[in-house]
A protein has these predicted regions:
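Extracytoplasmic cell-surface/polysaccharide-interacting catalytic and binding patches
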Residues: 32-130, 145-242
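Positively charged n-region of N-terminal signal peptides that target proteins for export
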Residues: 2-12
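Extracytoplasmic/periplasmic soluble domains downstream of a signal peptide or transmembrane helix
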Residues: 136-140, 183-185
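Sec-dependent N-terminal signal peptides of Gram-positive bacterial secreted proteins and lipoproteins
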Residues: 12-27
């Protein structure tokens, strides 16, 4: 059945009113949700952030060792070269004398060695350690292998100064670690080892004299028979490393 124009108009108005009412309620709901969201956001923003009090950590202050304490040279002179000959077979005995590969000295002696190192660096060199603290047990082993007081201190009559932790056997190298010409190698028992320097090259003699000058100014005394051997002028008792 066909509807009249009047009825069609009536139907159209009803649909329009329903659509309007529906849009009104949807818009109103959206506004309410927006208000709620804004309210929640404002509450979050308004909530004060709790203050965080920074925790202060007391820095660890290491107590300076006493002069008589044995310390690792590398802990204080990190750029020194360590080449302990008695910890290898590269020595006159051909055997390992002690197992430790750590160069140790009395703290008081180490400070003087540090001074020598700083002076040498100004001149383009640095120290190379061949031997430092030597346990008295190692001295007995050396004497057992070579019982000659000309070359090895007799531990039955008095220990080597190395066993006191205040003596080093050293040479110098360039700042890049390259070898420098010196009178002889380590544990050389010829006349080249003494401090006469008349039977070595001019360059070797001058380098040895430079080392001697720097070490003496730092507070060390050299041994006439070995250009590489230096002892702290301050004495310490014999030390046994257990």
């Amino acid at each position: 059945m066909l509807l009249s124009g009047k009825e069609n108009m009536k139907k159209f108005l009803i649909i329009t009113v329903l659509a309007f009412v529906s849009c009104f309620f949807m818009t109103n709901n959206m506004q309410e949700e927006t208000k709620e969201n804004v309210k929640d956001f404002e509450e979050v923003v308004a909530t004060p952030t709790p203050e965080v009090t920074p925790t202060y950590v007391e820095p660890e202050i290491k107590e300076e060792p006493k002069d008589e304490e044995l310390v690792k040279i590398l802990d204080y002179i990190p750029d020194v070269v360590i080449d302990l000959k008695y910890a290898t077979e590269e020595n006159f005995t051909g055997v390992v004398i002690y197992e430790s590969d750590e160069a140790l000295l009395r703290y008081g002696t180490m400070k003087k060695l540090e001074k020598a190192q700083e002076e040498l660096k100004k001149l383009g060199y640095k120290l190379c350690i061949w031997d430092a603290f030597r346990p008295k047990e190692a001295q007995f082993k050396l004497w057992e292998i070579c019982p000659n007081p000309i070359y090895v201190a007799n531990p039955n009559k008095g220990f080597s100064k190395h066993s006191r932790g205040n003596t080093v056997d050293i040479t110098i190298v360039s700042l890049s670690g390259e070898k420098v010409e010196m009178p002889s190698g380590f544990d050389d028992f010829t006349k080249k080892a003494d401090r006469d320097y008349s039977d070595v090259s001019k360059e070797a003699g001058e380098n040895a004299k430079l080392l001697e000058k720097v070490m003496e100014e730092a507070g060390f005394k050299g041994y006439a028979g070995e250009w590489w051997h230096y002892s702290d002028e301050k004495e310490y008792p014999v030390f046994s490393q257990d």
